[in-house]
Amino acid sequence: MTNGAITDLKKLTKLYDDAHLLSHVSRKVSSENELMAVMKKTGGKRPMIFHHVDDYAAPVVTGLGGTRDLLASSMGIRAGMLRQHLAHAITHPLAPHVVTQAPCQQRCITAPFSLDSYFPVLRHYEKDNGRFLISGMLTAKSDDGSKTYTSIRRMWYMGANKTTLLITSREMQQQLARHEQTHTPMEIALVFGLVPGVVLGSQISTHLYNADKLAVTGALLGKPLDVVPCKTVKLEVPADAQVVLEGKCFRGSNRRKVPLARWRTTTARLPSFRSANFPA
């Protein structure tokens, strides 16, 4: 379906729409269970765009990499090449390319603010104990700054600009423990609106392969990944991201007896959603 990797979510969404692979949900849906219930009818295997979620102006897209065929196509390869392509990217990484301006800097919002004033935070199951952010890519750096960690984390929304963060990575747990010993928070960024290839790059093991995940991601996409420096933390994030939350992670404030670290955002950076090239 593609002649090369797609790095921009809006372009990929339009490509799926042009190929009649995108399902449009035009009626208003609720962020309380309903959106996820509709998506689950397809098993997450069908690209979907929800045009009216509660009263938010921005649409919500799901399922862009829900099958091996979709994932491979977004990177310009065949599904049968996925393993070989990933192995080659791990062994032949491409260092990211730093840019000074990016779409995710079109609109900058500083605390105090509430995340759910700008985009929906979903309740996924009826019996969930709250609303969760689940599709954001966490970005952090090793203590010496030599490696970038990226991963998909589930975050329980606490209201305003606070959320919990579940960390299962051994290296990051150890890093958090060192920050706790020195009473210093760990700088992080949470990134939304990424193409499937970037998400795939976040899933390899940094510990096993001793790799910088953003460099592996560049190899997956066939060219160095454009990254832009954050405004309030010393990190770089994908320049084509739709939403970037910058913040700091605090250990030792678990909530509801769940082993989660506490995360407090300091700045939310959002693009101009109204100028996005989504199908009408």
Placement of each model-derived feature along the sequence:
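Extended, highly charged
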Residues: M1-A280
